[in-house]
Amino acid sequence: MKQSNKGFDHSYNAQAVVDAENQIIVAAEVTDAANDKRQGVPLGQAALDNLDAAGIERPQAADGTLLPIPNTLDSGYFSEEAVEKLADMGLDPHIATGRQKHNQAPVAPAAGAAPTEASVKEKMAHKLRSAAGKALYAARKHIIEPVFGQIKSARGIRAFLLRGQEKVSAEWQLICLTHNLLKVWRCATRAVAS
């Protein structure tokens, strides 16, 4: 990956999908891709596969049809293809379409449905401007960001110790497993204390 010193380092990009309720890592992968644009779909599929393997049922409507599972991703993951594929998989993607500049006036909330002739990007921007979209996307910083903060700051894991993508991937899986064990242990001790 290109680094700020204008050179290239062999670096890895750690990815994770986290549940909103307990900050349990549901899926984790490592890639050597410099950006996240092509990572949302494989991560979404891995999360669904892991939920299915764990026997966790997807939410259903009263008539038994599967409800889309909301998920939020930052602007680095946005592509029209990703939005469409995630929706086809049974997810309800909320992906930022770009960055808001500092000191920029907030965008007015969206009212009603997006125009039918709007592009995927325009529909996503409209969705994120709705009250529900804003609330869901704002929760993202309380769901995924603390997980990476806990791993990097609280546990001091700032770099991988192994080399080679297969070994680094195994190391990342172990880091995520220990994170999940700590979360489960804390949930269990809170339940016992109650």
Spans of model-derived segments:
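Anion-binding and metal-coordination hotspots
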Residues: 1-194
